[in-house]
Amino acid sequence: MTTILKHLPVGQRIGIAFSGGLDTSAALLWMRQKGAVPYAYTANLGQPDEEDYDAIPRRAMEYGAENARLIDCRKQLVAEGIAAIQCGAFHNTTGGLTYFNTTPLGRAVTGTMLVAAMKEDGVNIWGDGSTYKGNDIERFYRYGLLTNAELQIYKPWLDTDFIDELGGRHEMSEFMIACGFDYKMSVEKAYSTDSNMLGATHEAKDLEYLNSSVKIVNPIMGVKFWDESVKIPAEEVTVRFEQGHPVALNGKTFSDDVEMMLEANRIGGRHGLGMSDQIENRIIEAKSRGIYEAPGMALLHIAYERLLTGIHNEDTIEQYHAHGRQLGRLLYQGRWFDSQALMLRDSLQRWVASQITGEVTLELRHGNDYSILNTVSENLTYKPERLTMEKGDSVFSPDDRIGQLTMRNLDITDTREKLFGYAKTGLLSSSAASGVPQMENLENKGQ
């Protein structure tokens, strides 16, 4: 069976991930007019820039959908976001600022929950608005087929007939008007935005050029912290975790995790926390650039890792970072539910996150400028009395340290011998002023 359909399957049911925007509206109307039977599915991901979710299915019905459903994905999205924090599943960082993989998390939830809803309705053909150059076309492909092995894919933006007729936003707008729908194009921004409750992605258009900065972006989850006219008073916030799960903000507990994430977004957003500018490698190995917002994810991540460093030993922390980066890349590639990702998630949640219990107090200022004011946990292995510089009882003596240093002579001697071995082969040069070989000064040698 052909998995990807290049042309519209006339007379068959097609499920379309319907956002209510111009692209999916025109695609739905066009498919109906050409003889397909479109079903519209809208994911409620708690997008901060969406004002009326209930109106979206109604519009889909007006444009010719056989049926239209609104699928509440918020609870599952927040659950996956918390899992990503517990595992440190983030691999794109620049200068210490992290991209929290909020779009990949959203695609994992959308791609599974919408296809599951389609399957309930007997719809086994899926279309969405992803383009052939991006990451989402592969993410949705993987998640869709994982959920429904019988799924076929039809994307209007891969259909030459659709492209020839409605290949641009201007053509789509004229098509909608000609069909009796007074659909006016929204004012074009200098970039495109995609968002969910966990974060927002700003990319493309002017942001494709590296001489365009965050200053052209209007945040939808925070504030322009770089603008001196925006007054942002400092704010103290306390985050409490129990067994790796965030349970309270400023002492307030929540009825569910969705409400907790919304409050974390409000707190972090007041300061512009979690904004970052990243150059990343897409799945197809081409580089792209995005500016990201994730105020709630950033707040929880900072507090989580503060507790992590005070509770776990160095080797465990090293494995957390290494496995977290590996898991983050799998998430980015649309492999969040693959066996290798599940293996990494299970080990990190079981052996790392389960011990993260405690409370962290921070002072938030402008953007990613913050201070940690206090860290409290019954699981802390940080014991200041062990290394105090003050006179008093100690868990080890000067003689103990002398013995420990003496044992180091073994590997120090081995290292010296290796350095001289490198010098003999020309990798290092001998120096009259030093007792050990040194790196060649390539500049002095004219290289």
UniProtKB/Swiss-Prot annotation:
| EC identifiers of the protein | 6.3.4.5
First-listed, main subcellular location of the protein, grouped into a coarse class:
cytoplasm
Q: In which pathway does it act?
A: Amino-acid biosynthesis; L-arginine biosynthesis; L-arginine from L-ornithine and carbamoyl phosphate: step 2/3
Tell me the PROSITE patterns matching this sequence: ARGININOSUCCIN_SYN_1, ARGININOSUCCIN_SYN_2
Recite the UniProt keywords alphabetically.
Amino-acid biosynthesis, Arginine biosynthesis, ATP-binding, Cytoplasm, Ligase, Nucleotide-binding
Matching entries from PANTHER family are given as: ARGININOSUCCINATE SYNTHASE
Q: What is this protein called?
A: Argininosuccinate synthase
Tell me the organism: Shigella dysenteriae serotype 1 (strain Sd197)
Gene, per the UniProt record: argG
